[in-house]
Amino acid sequence: MSGKELNKIVAAILFASLIAMMVGFIANILYKPVLEPKHRGYSIAVQEVSEAPTTQAQAPINIPELMKTANADNGREIAKKCLMCHSLDKDGPNKIGPHLWDVAGRPKASITDYKYSPALSALGGNWDDDSLFAFLHKPSSYAPGTKMSFAGISKPQDIADVILFLKTYVHDK
């Protein structure tokens, strides 16, 4: 290969590169891309829900009356969702939550081999009907900062049924 032929090949490569660059510059001039969007993503209209009390005052819940009409069999059905995280066996293992054997009347945060959240450990007192009712209704309101991620049981009669069911798992049995 002679020097002339080599020069022609190099010139052809340089000319092709120059043409490619010119096409790129012209394309950028003709088609200006939008680099920064005005808003990122999509806006979704969401209705705000406030936790403020409604204008209608709710009647206080009479827990002793609910306990009189409580049904342990119904409580057993409702409590099945508890068994994913809790055990009902006497001296049963702790799962995600502590075992619930003899929970009614027991001091709060009293299972020694379970690590309770500081929120629940600080409460003190025993698990009576009122405290169990409040905790089962909405654990995060009763003990803000609790590890229990359960949303709660909304129907008061269902809560009373679960409490009566839990009372069947006591030290006398």
Curated annotation (Swiss-Prot):
Signal peptide bounds: none
GO cellular component assignments: plasma membrane
Family statement: Belongs to the cytochrome c family.
Periplasmic side: 30-173
Ranges facing Cytoplasmic side: 1-8
Protein's UniProt keywords contain Cell membrane: yes
Source species, domain of life: Bacteria
Annotated binding of heme c, by residue: 82, 85-86, 148
Function of the protein: May be involved in electron transfer from bc1 complex to aa3.
Keyword entries, A-Z: Cell membrane, Electron transport, Heme, Iron, Membrane, Metal-binding, Signal-anchor, Transmembrane, Transmembrane helix, Transport
Transmembrane domains' residue ranges: 9-29
Record PTM text: Binds 1 heme c group covalently per subunit.
Natural source organism: Rickettsia bellii (strain RML369-C)
InterPro entries tied to this protein: Cyt_c-like_dom, Cyt_c-like_dom_sf, Cyt_c_1A/1B
Entry's localization field: Cell membrane
UniProt topology in membrane: Single-pass type II membrane protein
Name this protein carries in UniProt: Cytochrome c homolog
GO MF, any single term: metal ion binding
